[in-house]
Design a protein with these regions (language model features):
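Acidic/His-rich, metal-assisted hydrolase cores and their charged scaffolds
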Residues: 1-168
Length: 168
């Protein structure tokens, strides 16, 4: 999913669809997603579809662009939350039950100017599900955090095959 999201963000930036913040930074803050992105970069012909390969033929990397930052260390991850500029943070969620996403939620859920976009399934009983179902407050690291950010869900990027995909 991370690579699909990067593909779409590259297009959004290339088409100047974000007015006033065209050069916004994008952080991939998941060590596994960073490794997967590296695999995509090293195996272009096996990983990209026809549309992405057309970009490659034009000398355009379909999942890279100015402002893309790959966060590896925990120090790099923590620093993201202290930058004041508008930004996109792509962080593996684990349904918001563990990992770096919890720190990003702690620093951004209370901010009405923030948007948290879920692109994966959130199981019943998880923090992610509570947030998408409209929780007004959640607990992170033992602290109550008011949910004032805009919460959105995009279901078109499942990381799992559907029934037909499994049969193939």
């Amino acid at each position: 999913r991370t690579q699909e999201i990067l593909y779409f963000i590259r297009k959004i930036k290339a088409d100047n669809l974000v007015t006033g913040h065209g050069n916004f930074p994008v952080y991939v803050d998941s060590p596994m997603a960073v490794r997967a992105t590296s695999i995509f970069q090293d195996n272009i012909s096996q990983c990209f579809d026809d549309a992405a390969m057309e970009l490659v033929k034009q000398g355009i990397n379909p999942i890279s662009f100015p402002g893309l930052n790959l966060s590896i260390t925990s120090e790099e991850s923590k620093a993201i939350n202290f930058e004041e500029t508008p930004k996109v943070i792509i962080s593996a969620s684990g349904m918001c039950e563990a990992g770096r996403i919890r720190h990003h939620l702690k620093h951004n859920l209370w901010r009405p100017e923030s948007t948290v976009l879920f692109v994966g399934y959130q199981a019943v009983g998880t923090l992610g599900r509570a947030i998408i179902e409209g929780a007004k407050e959640v607990r992170l690291f033992g602290e109550p955090i008011e949910v004032r950010a805009k919460i959105r869900q995009f279901n078109g990027l499942s990381g799992h095959a559907d029934k037909n995909g499994l049969v193939e």
